[in-house]
């Protein structure tokens, strides 16, 4: 079936649902590998990607592994001292702000790149992320995004660089660019089919499932990565309905209260369900 692009019309269920949140910014982008159908709503709004930027880090880790520049079984020292891109001054990550605490008790020890990558994705470990970014190089992460032809996505720094944040020097992405990235992984076009399958397996282990997967039917697998910082809440992934090709989906939100994240999760879960019903019936 030929590809067709559908921009959400005013009377569709998705647009109607989003209109219930006039004081929030809600973006959605979908690509259905079965039909080539695309669904967009505010998909080009640029936002802070929060921890969804960990997917590009994972892609560069696997690219360098494929190129023989590193081994996934290589062990990296665990430390908590990093340098701001603003002036090189040192900063440390706050354990309280990290959704994975396990590595902080292991400072001075080591862990494999494979396990650090898993913790970065399934538990959204900030410390694992910064360790991996120092190993592969932040500039290489961003360069690989560009080499893949993914527009409107930039990774320029690691996590919790507060000096950079105060100067608005941040990573950025849109729902459209994130869906483009997840589509390429689903299609096996990032590095190799084997590498994509391995990255999908990592994302299938995601431990935070309050958004895209929450209201989908039983038996539907979702390989995804969540993101949250301040009042940005996102989820990007690949949804695998039974007995058909998957679809790539990215949901970005801004403006939900930081102290009640359930509002954002519930909104994204509803949107995911609406899109699933539209595509699958």
Language-model-derived ranges and their functions:
Residues 4-48:
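Beta-lactamase-like hydrolase cores
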Residues 8, 47-56, 107-115, 122-123, ...:
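Soluble non-cytosolic domains of exported or imported proteins
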Residues 10-23, 37-38, 135, 179-210, ...:
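Structured C-terminal helix/loop/strand segments within mature extracytoplasmic catalytic/sensor domains
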Residues 23-26, 42-44, 52, 71-73, ...:
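Extracytoplasmic
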Residues 25, 109-113, 127-182, 187:
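Mid-domain, small-residue-enriched loop/turn segments at the edges of structured enzyme/sensor domains
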Residues 36, 49-81, 120, 249:
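Active-site SXXK
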Residues 72-92, 136-137:
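Acidic helix-start/capping segments at beta-turn-to-alpha-helix junctions
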Residues 83-130:
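Conserved catalytic neighborhood of penicillin-recognizing serine enzymes
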């Amino acid at each position: 079936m030929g590809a067709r692009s559908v921009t959400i019309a005013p009377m569709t269920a998705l647009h109607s649902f989003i209109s219930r949140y006039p004081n929030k910014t809600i973006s959605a982008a979908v690509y259905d590998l079965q039909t080539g159908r695309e669904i967009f709503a505010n998909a080009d709004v640029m936002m802070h990607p929060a921890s969804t930027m960990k997917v590009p880090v994972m892609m560069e880790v696997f690219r360098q592994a494929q190129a023989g520049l590193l081994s996934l079984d290589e062990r990296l020292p665990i430390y908590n001292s990093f340098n701001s891109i603003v002036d090189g001054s040192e900063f440390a990550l706050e354990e309280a702000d990290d959704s994975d605490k396990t590595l902080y008790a292991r400072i001075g020890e080591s862990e494999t790149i494979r396990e650090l990558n898993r913790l970065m994705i399934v538990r959204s470990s900030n410390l694992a992320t910064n360790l991996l970014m120092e190993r592969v190089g932040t500039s290489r992460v961003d360069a690989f995004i560009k080499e893949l032809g993914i527009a409107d996505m930039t990774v320029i720094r690691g996590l919790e660089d507060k000096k950079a944040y105060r100067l608005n020097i941040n990573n950025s992405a849109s729902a459209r660019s994130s869906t483009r990235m997840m589509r390429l992984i689903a299609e096996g076009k990032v590095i190799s089919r084997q590498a994509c399958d391995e990255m999908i397996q990592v994302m299938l282990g995601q431990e935070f499932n309050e958004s895209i997967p929450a209201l989908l039917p039983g038996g539907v697998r979702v390989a995804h990565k969540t993101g949250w910082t301040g009042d940005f809440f996102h989820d990007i992934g690949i949804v695998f309905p039974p007995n058909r090709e998957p679809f790539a989906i990215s949901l970005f939100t801004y403006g939900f209260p930081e102290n009640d994240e359930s509002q954002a999760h519930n909104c994204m879960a509803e949107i995911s369900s609406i899109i699933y019903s539209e595509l699958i019936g």
